Amino acid sequence: MLTELEKALNSIIDVYHKYSLIKGNFHAVYRDDLKKLLETECPQYIRKKGADVWFKELDINTDGAVNFQEFLILVIKMGVAAHKKSHEESHKE
C-alpha cells in the first residue's frame, strides 16, 4: 500500500506525463503544452507570471522544453506558496 507522499509523487509524475505525452515525449513539455499545464493544473499560481515567463524560468538548459527535473522547480515553488497560504488562512480563523 502506498503512503500519502508516495501517492502525491505518483500524481505529480502523472500530471507531467499527461502534458509531455501530448507531443509523444516522456521527457519534455514544450512551451505551448506548459501553458496548457499551467492554466489547467495550477491557475492560481500563474496569476503573477505568464506562461512565457514560467517557461524561461524553468527551461534551465535552454533546450526548448521543460524536462521533469525542471518541472520539479515549478512543483517546489507551488508547494512553498501553498504552504504559506495555508498558514495565512489558519491565522484568519
From Swiss-Prot:
Signal peptide: none annotated. Zn(2+) binds at H17, H27, H83, H87. Induction: (Microbial infection) Expression is highly induced in CD14(+) monocytes, neutrophils, and developing neutrophils of patients infected by SARS-COV-2. It is a peripheral membrane protein. Residues 12-47, 46-81 form the EF-hand domain. One of its GO terms (biological process) is defense response to fungus. GO terms for molecular function: arachidonate binding; calcium ion binding; calcium-dependent protein binding; microtubule binding; RAGE receptor binding; Toll-like receptor 4 binding; zinc ion binding. One of its GO terms (cellular component) is cytoskeleton. It comes from the Eukaryota. Its main location: secreted. Calprotectin (S100A8/A9) activity on TLR4 signaling is inhibited by paquinimod. The modification S-nitrosocysteine is found at C42. Calprotectin (S100A8/9) is predominantly expressed in myeloid cells. Except for inflammatory conditions, the expression is restricted to a specific stage of myeloid differentiation since both proteins are expressed in circulating neutrophils and monocytes but are absent in normal tissue macrophages and lymphocytes. Under chronic inflammatory conditions, such as psoriasis and malignant disorders, also expressed in the epidermis. It is found in: Secreted; Cytoplasm; Cytoplasm, Cytoskeleton; Cell membrane. Ca(2+) 2 binds at D59, N61, D63, E70. InterPro entries: EF-hand-dom_pair (IPR011992), EF_Hand_1_Ca_BS (IPR018247), EF_hand_dom (IPR002048), S100/CaBP7/8-like_CS (IPR001751), S100_Ca-bd_sub (IPR013787). Keywords: Antimicrobial, Apoptosis, Autophagy, Calcium, Cell membrane, Chemotaxis, Cytoplasm, Cytoskeleton, Immunity, Inflammatory response, Innate immunity, Membrane, Metal-binding, Repeat, S-nitrosylation, Secreted, Zinc. PROSITE patterns: EF_HAND_1, EF_HAND_2, S100_CABP. Ca(2+) 1 binds at D33. Binds two calcium ions per molecule with an affinity similar to that of the S100 proteins. Homodimer. Preferentially exists as a heterodimer or heterotetramer with S100A9 known as calprotectin (S100A8/A9). S100A8 interacts with AGER, ATP2A2 and with the heterodimeric complex formed by TLR4 and LY96. Interacts with GAPDH. Calprotectin (S100A8/9) interacts with CEACAM3 and tubulin filaments in a calcium-dependent manner. Heterotetrameric calprotectin (S100A8/A9) interacts with ANXA6 and associates with tubulin filaments in activated monocytes. S100A8 and calprotectin (S100A8/9) interact with NCF2/P67PHOX, RAC1 and RAC2. Calprotectin (S100A8/9) interacts with CYBA and CYBB. S100A8 is a calcium- and zinc-binding protein which plays a prominent role in the regulation of inflammatory processes and immune response. It can induce neutrophil chemotaxis and adhesion. Predominantly found as calprotectin (S100A8/A9) which has a wide plethora of intra- and extracellular functions. The intracellular functions include: facilitating leukocyte arachidonic acid trafficking and metabolism, modulation of the tubulin-dependent cytoskeleton during migration of phagocytes and activation of the neutrophilic NADPH-oxidase. (Microbial infection) Upon infection by human coronavirus SARS-CoV-2, may induce expansion of aberrant immature neutrophils in a TLR4-dependent manner. This is Protein S100-A8. The lineage of its organism: Eukaryota, Metazoa, Chordata, Craniata, Vertebrata.
